[in-house]
Regions:
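Glycine-rich nucleotide phosphate-binding loop and flanking beta-alpha elements
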Residues: 29-30, 59, 102
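Terminal domain-start leader segments
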Residues: 1-52, 79-90, 108-112, 131, ...
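Short, surface-exposed linear patches
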Residues: 43-46, 64-66, 72-76, 115-119, ...
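Flexible, acidic/His-enriched mid-domain "rim/lid" segments that flank
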Residues: 77-161
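Structural motif
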Residues: 24-26, 53-55, 76, 96-101
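Compact, glycine/acidic-enriched structural inserts
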Residues: 53-84
Length: 161
């Protein structure tokens, strides 16, 4: 599952003339890595991938994402760690989540980075649902339907919520 997502992401990058991407948006972080920790960033190149997090989450990251990513502790220096990965991977053009990466973080990453930057929107890659996602959505919908059906007898005019 994650392997196919990373492959689709890399194909997306090549279509957009980029050879790497920085991912910090929690939804994309989870989608492309399975990492559910509270803090982290992905730097994905065409043949390497790093998940940066802090010491609170390194074990969790290794358990959830260690198969696909090199897990690293950023030691409270996330921006410089991301920049280091971009330079180490020799990325020429890095995509970044324009609507999520803060200007402050962008400035800190780009200062000293040896690559160019390209804003990109990765939501289209999450739009096509996989079979397990459809199954989970159906299950959630059924739970919501049952909860609403259980609530209906109590909803009457004049009844306080």
């Amino acid at each position: 599952m994650i392997e196919q997502r990373i492959a689709r992401l890399r194909a997306f990058l090549q279509e957009h003339d980029a050879d790497g991407v920085i991912i910090v948006q929690p939804e994309n972080l989870r989608y492309f890595s399975a990492f559910t920790g509270g803090e982290g960033a992905l730097v994905i190149g065409l043949d390497q991938a790093v998940l940066w997090t802090d010491s609170r989450y390194t074990e969790q990251a290794a358990n959830q994402s260690g198969t696909w990513y090199d897990i690293k502790n950023h030691h409270n220096a996330l921006s410089s760690s991301i920049r280091s990965s971009l330079n180490d991977m020799e990325i020429g053009v890095a995509g970044y989540e324009e609507n999520f990466l803060t200007h402050f973080m962008y400035e800190n990453i780009s200062d000293g980075a040896l690559c160019g930057f390209l804003p990109c929107d990765l939501t289209s890659l999450r739009a096509v649902k996989e079979p397990y996602e459809l199954k989970a959505t159906r299950k959630a919908s059924n739970i919501a339907d049952r909860a609403f059906a259980d609530l209906l007898p109590y909803i009457k005019p004049g009844v306080t919520e």
